[in-house]
Amino acid sequence: MRNAVIVDSVRTGLAKSFRGGFNNTRADNMTAHVVNALLERNPKVDASMVEDIILGCGNPEGAQGHNIARNVAVLSDLPIETGGVTINRYCSSGLNSIAMAATQIQSGFYDCIIAGGVESISTSQGHTNMHMYVNDKLAEEVPGIYHAMGTTAEAVADRYNVSREAQDEYALSSQQRCAAAQDAGLYDDEIIPMETKMILKNKETGAEKEVDVTVDRDDCNRPETTLDGLSSLNPVFNPEGGSVTAGNSSQLSDGASVTLIMSEEKANELGLKPMAYFRGFTTVGCQPDEMGIGPVYSIPKLLDSAGLTVDDIDLWELNEAFASQVVYLSLIHISEPTRLGF
């Protein structure tokens, strides 16, 4: 089987949903912008070499529906022959798109694919088609499948004894590390600035107006966060006795990211140095009402298939949306905080 390599990866800044710079920007326009930037900074890769775009999208309907991946291919500087497919595995949709691209390259079906993810919560949340949305049998027998993610985070905290203090401490550490990375310019090379128009709303009158903005950095993190501030926040999903707050949960954000993936042979032919090699991917289902603990089961499966152990991995990224999930996962698998990405 061939090696699949990641050659380059770019993204927009992450903007606060509804209140940030992308609150009036279509998801397909965001993504086409970063696709073009990816092509521009890799001139050895002719656009005609890109055979497909695979995009993950957690809510692929409305303004980000109609097979957004194909729309992006046509909107961008790629030729009409480049295909596009949109996949949905909710929060891991973008990751799954990269895995899908890599495995197709490993299998020899493709040489060069652009894969990534996009989400415009500003233009999609509240605009979902709710016609026949709930399956009555599922709702009765497995109600957790329709729970809000924050409700599942509360279930994890409750069932596995993850304290409010541990969640807030992790959240503070995450904010501090993110701020340090921004200050050190560690994100600068991957973020592609984008000029767009956002909607500003007057809080007193409700009047709205469009203003020109440039999104060139992440604006969702809060560098000024303190432990006292976190501990003062009220629980959101279970006001009576819960522990999941706005401070120890991920924010809602808008943004797009794309990655250039190709066979190692093609990269060598073009004189391109890989950033990384794709080594494996797996999935394991768990009870829907505690969906955030999936990595408890998928990590051992993936390591076993690769013949590795937890200690063989220098840095882990547990990309979960709630501190309760990350704290529990790290207790199970990763005992050294310095080896855990934020």
What label would you give each PLM region?
Residues 1-15:
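N-terminal amphipathic/basic leader segments beginning at the initiator methionine
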Residues 10-13, 24-33, 44, 169-269:
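N-terminal extracellular/periplasmic Venus flytrap/periplasmic-binding protein-like
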Residues 13-39, 59-62, 85-99, 140-148, ...:
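Active-site pocket-shaping loop/turn-to-helix segments
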Residues 22-113, 118-136, 191-215, 289-290, ...:
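Conserved beta-ketoacyl condensing-enzyme motif
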Residues 87-118, 157-187, 258-265:
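Active-site-proximal alpha-helical scaffold in enzymes
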Residues 121-158, 220-245:
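Glycine-/small-residue-rich "gating" segment that lines the acyl/pantetheine channel
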Residues 213-246, 252-255, 259-323, 327-331:
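A glycine- and small/hydrophobic-rich beta-loop-beta segment
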Residues 332-342:
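Single conserved hydrophobic/aromatic residue that forms the stacking wall/gate
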